[in-house]
Amino acid sequence: MPRRRVIGQRKILPDPKFGSELLAKFVNILMVDGKKSTAEAIVYTALETLAQRSGKDFLEAFEVALDNVRPTVEVKSRRVGGSTYQVPVEVRPVRRNALAMRWIVDAARKRGDKSMALRLANELSDAAENKGSAVKKREDVHRMAEANKAFAHYRW
């Protein structure tokens, strides 16, 4: 714990096109080497493609995809008497969003499609349909937490 004052979390400015803080955070996670305009162009193109496929609003389609990837529990290592246990803990709401976005971007980067915008659109549409690598990652994390439910009493 710091002895000085606790520094508050920085406020992220909303996305210029849709006015969404969630989308602005997503752009920041996708951004590489500080190239924000490139990241924004990729996200907007991907969202347009996603909206055309699903027939929904841009942000609504994005929200559905994000909802399907958000984890509710995860495991954290906890050392007790010489042995390390994987203890299941509930994920805070801010971390849920961050993990979901990170998993979607990582899964999109690993796909083999032509452009990053197309890869991202495909991953988001897969996530909206409850399939794809990002959803599999969430299910793996949930399965790990379920398997280690016996150690839940070590929570701190």
Curated annotation (Swiss-Prot):
Coiled coil: none
GO (cellular component) term, any one: ribosome
GO biological process: ribosomal small subunit assembly; translation
UniProtKB keywords: Ribonucleoprotein, Ribosomal protein, RNA-binding, rRNA-binding, tRNA-binding
Stretches that traverse the bilayer: none
Domain of life: Bacteria
GO MF assignments: mRNA binding; rRNA binding; structural constituent of ribosome; tRNA binding
Description of how the protein assembles with itself and partners: Part of the 30S ribosomal subunit. Contacts proteins S9 and S11.
Function field: One of the primary rRNA binding proteins, it binds directly to 16S rRNA where it nucleates assembly of the head domain of the 30S subunit. Is located at the subunit interface close to the decoding center, probably blocks exit of the E-site tRNA.
Family: Belongs to the universal ribosomal protein uS7 family.
Protein name as annotated: Small ribosomal subunit protein uS7
Organism: Yersinia pestis
